[in-house]
């Protein structure tokens, strides 16, 4: 299955605690918790472009599976990491955050991020 497509956030778990743990200010946490972000994924072999739009904030990351890339984190910082593919999962570690994005079925993406013992999960559906 291909990741390519546009997905809208449907649900999320542990949003506030995770955002606090990564250092986002309360004002941004409150502002962002009710916004349904849109993720657009373009996949061409091992090359990916991921655009995440949350309100007026847009994060664009491009990477090639297995090669080091500079990626923008949720806090807006840039960090180098290597994205690995494991079947229908993309995995990366950035600044201590472990991220796994799984194509659950043809229409659903689950993204789980973990920092220490604090986890965050978001489910997005294809639109």
Swiss-Prot record:
GO terms for molecular function: lipid binding. It comes from the Eukaryota. SUPFAM superfamilies: Lipocalins (SSF50814). The keyword Cytoplasm applies. The gene is fabp1. Belongs to the calycin superfamily. Fatty-acid binding protein (FABP) family. It comes from Epinephelus coioides (Orange-spotted grouper). Keywords: Cytoplasm, Lipid-binding, Transport. Its main location: cytoplasm. It is found in: Cytoplasm. This is Fatty acid-binding protein, liver-type. Gene3D superfamilies: 2.40.128.20. The keyword ATP-binding does not apply. Transmembrane segments: none annotated. GO terms for cellular component: cytoplasm. InterPro entries: Calycin (IPR012674), Fatty_acid-bd (IPR000463), ILBP (IPR031259).
